[in-house]
Amino acid sequence: MPSELPNFIPAVPEMFVLFMALVILLAGVFIKKRHQIPYYLTQITLILVAGLTWYIFTYSDFAETSFTFHHMFVLDRFSVYLKLFIYLSVFFAFIYAREYNDERKIPHTEFYVLGLLSMLGMVALVSSSNLLTVFLGLELLSLPTYAMVALYRNKTRSVEAGMKYFVIGAIASGMLLYGMSMIFGATQSLDLTEIAKAVSATPLHQNLILVFGLVFIVAGVAFKLGTAPFHMWVPDVYEGAPSSVTLFISTAPKIAAYAMIIRLLILGMPALHVQWHQMLIVVAILSMGIGNFAAIVQSNIKRMLAYSSIAHMGYMLLGVLCGTRNGYAAAMFYTITYSLMSLGAFGMVVLMSRGGFEAENINDFAGLNSRNPWLAFMMMLILFSLAGVPPLVGFIAKVGVLDALIQVHLVWLAVLAVLFAIVGAYYYIRVVKVMYFESAPPQLKPIRCSLEMKIAISLNGLAVLFIGIFPGWLYALSHLAF
């Protein structure tokens, strides 16, 4: 019996990204003198694929949720919204990275091609409805980033960070795959919808292999998210990688990892909510505690922001573990806004790193207000937002998660989260103090950057303020996704 051909239209944007990645790779080989062409081709690709994704979802004849490739790929509101934010995040990451990479002679074509391929893994992961596509998307996301971390071949720390990232990433993938194999063995299916039905129909005491599989899946996901106690790679990789790569891996992949949690736990195993709820509580508390307390003692701003990301992913998990639509939407809002804030923070680190100078220490930001008041103001907005100061978006995101916790009577966890947030505010305010109340060392060069970079960092900083004052549209979007 001949098999029915899959409908390729829902996956056309992903195919377009793959095609353009190959075109840009060839362009980089044959047009070596005009080294900016790969950059502009990449940015045009991101604009076109965002428009194509929105057009296919909005104006095609599909229902609100459509499956293709034998139920392995799904196009729904959740996937479309997250894809658009991934495209936006990568677009800004490439703007910030261009001058930094050119100054350090980091291979530009390879950087953009690997970035696009990693982004292809992210969007494939977001649209996964099968354990096979979840794993393939995750590996396509991860493998290019291992190479990107080690791209700065003249820097030993970069190569070392790439090796660490690869080895620990391989362990995480192995754990995740082992967990998936147990789930497949217990349910006889790779389809997440079918797995959910099989898990609901099976009394847990008759099939303990499901719980073992769940433990390995949660551990693998925690590794990929960089949450405690599986966080050991995060500070070393963030510090050792070129700042342009740190910027990339600290933003869009977090959105894709959030989507992986939703697909695996919410779509695939809702009947095991009690079990994964308890695991996520432990992971979230450890992440908030270790992340915030370890960040306090850091003098390297990239390590500080790395520990900060561990804490923020802990806050995001608080929304997921609520097990309610409101909690999932709050976690989605938190992930998107954290990605925006992280873009701005690492964007400033990249912007300050000029002429072979690496702005990696907190003291390198000393006197920034006297050197460039506008950039200091943008950095202050971003840092205060990360700290959760009203009326910035970081405050709104934290309030959303706390509200979701209180609604499910987890008041003790909400109080704990507030206490950790107070601890976390210290290390952000310390950077602001250095920028505004300490004088700049005389040897520091003037801050010069392109108009494109200034516009990007200004939009980034003002977006943090604007969404904080008018969060309703993004909250509505997050609720619509569920």
From Swiss-Prot:
Keywords: Cell inner membrane, Cell membrane, Membrane, NAD, Quinone, Translocase, Transmembrane, Transmembrane helix, Transport, Ubiquinone. Its EC number is 7.1.1.-. It catalyses: a quinone + NADH + 5 H(+)(in) = a quinol + NAD(+) + 4 H(+)(out). One of its GO terms (biological process) is ATP synthesis coupled electron transport. It is an enzyme of class 7 (translocase). Disulfide bonds: none annotated. The chain crosses the membrane at residues 11-31, 37-57, 77-97, 106-126, 131-151, 166-186, 208-228, 255-275, 279-299, 304-324, 332-352, 376-396, 404-424, 462-482. Signal peptide: none annotated. The keyword DNA repair does not apply. GO terms for cellular component: plasma membrane. Pfam families: Proton_antipo_M (PF00361). It is a multi-pass membrane protein. NDH-1 shuttles electrons from NADH, via FMN and iron-sulfur (Fe-S) centers, to quinones in the respiratory chain. The immediate electron acceptor for the enzyme in this species is believed to be ubiquinone. Couples the redox reaction to proton translocation (for every two electrons transferred, four hydrogen ions are translocated across the cytoplasmic membrane), and thus conserves the redox energy in a proton gradient. PANTHER family: NADH DEHYDROGENASE (PTHR22773). NDH-1 is composed of 14 different subunits. Subunits NuoA, H, J, K, L, M, N constitute the membrane sector of the complex. This is NADH-quinone oxidoreductase subunit N. It comes from Coxiella burnetii (strain RSA 493 / Nine Mile phase I). The gene is nuoN.
